[in-house]
Regions:
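Bacterial N-terminal signal peptides that target proteins for export
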Residues: 2-12
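Bacterial N-terminal signal peptides
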Residues: 10-21
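Catalytic-core regions of hydrolytic enzymes
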Residues: 26-140, 147-161
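Conserved hydrophobic/aromatic pocket- or pore-lining residues that grip, position, or stack substrates
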Residues: 40, 63, 165, 198, ...
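Generic non-transmembrane alpha-helical segments
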Residues: 69, 73, 77, 160, ...
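Active-site-adjacent mobile loop/cap segments within catalytic or ligand-binding domains
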Residues: 104, 111, 115-119, 170-233
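Short, well-ordered alpha-helical segments in soluble proteins
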Residues: 150-153, 169-173
Length: 233
């Protein structure tokens, strides 16, 4: 039938476009690095302290300091559009963070957090990528097919960037890699963009906390994450 043939042609056209877009030689030449937005999400903030310990070390503060350092490193690397979901110690709702991401449609979202354990022994870093649910739309609908293919591409991009960051952080946290796994990211609900969540050390561990709280060490962490991003996108 004419309509069936039209759908087949449309689907094949979409598949070719996605394949060409995903080829390294084409996708990385345009747009230029400086034109690609990156959003850095400093977890918690304001009245939301995040993890806290007895000496009044708050996760929200460590997240923000690292986010600012990472923004600076990426700007130095040629990324002109590096946006923060918060640039100060203030309350920013998940809805507000999501709206920024939705409007920006960035090449990548990096969400920064610090971990905590029941004792001071747990240490190291772990990374997560969001799982993108495929739709239940008509499988003959070209729009539904391209939607799922885009989600799969974003998933692959997320995992690739996470693996590069993971490798770079190994130099800062030797033998403290706690793995890479899938986890939901509420601020990406209904938004499909590449994203990586980084739990960057345990603030309940003295050595990890010192690295996060020390300016020089924090700069080294930011540089490692920036290198991973450059290699991954």
């Amino acid at each position: 039938e004419p309509m069936y043939r039209f759908r087949i042609v449309a689907v094949l056209t979409i598949i070719c476009a996605v394949i060409l877009y995903g080829m390294p030689g084409l996708s990385r030449s345009q747009p230029e690095r400086g034109d690609r937005a990156i959003v850095i999400d400093a977890g918690h903030g304001g009245s939301d302290l995040g993890v806290r310990i007895a000496d009044k070390t708050y996760e929200k503060d460590l997240n923000l300091r690292l986010a600012l350092a990472l923004q600076k490193e990426l700007a130095t690397s040629g990324y002109r559009r590096v946006l923060l979901t918060r640039s100060a110690d203030k309350d920013v709702s998940v809805k507000e963070r999501s709206e920024l991401i939705r409007k920006t449609n960035p090449a990548l979202v990096i969400s920064l957090h610090a971990n905590a354990g029941f004792s001071g022994k747990a240490r190291g870093y772990e990374l997560y990528f969001p799982g993108f649910k495929t739709g239940k739309e008509d499988r003959n609908d070209p729009a539904a097919i391209i939607g799922d293919m885009t989600k799969n591409k974003h998933l692959n991009d997320s995992v690739r960037v996470a693996q590069h960051i993971q490798k770079q952080l190994a130099e800062i946290f030797p033998k403290e890699n706690r793995g890479l796994r899938e986890a939901p990211l509420p601020l990406l609900e209904g938004i499909n963009v590449p994203a990586v969540i980084i739990e960057i050390g345990f603030i309940t561990n003295k050595e990890n906390r010192k690295k996060l709280d020390d300016e020089k060490s924090r700069q080294g962490i930011a540089q490692a994450i920036a290198r991973g991003i450059r290699e991954g996108i």
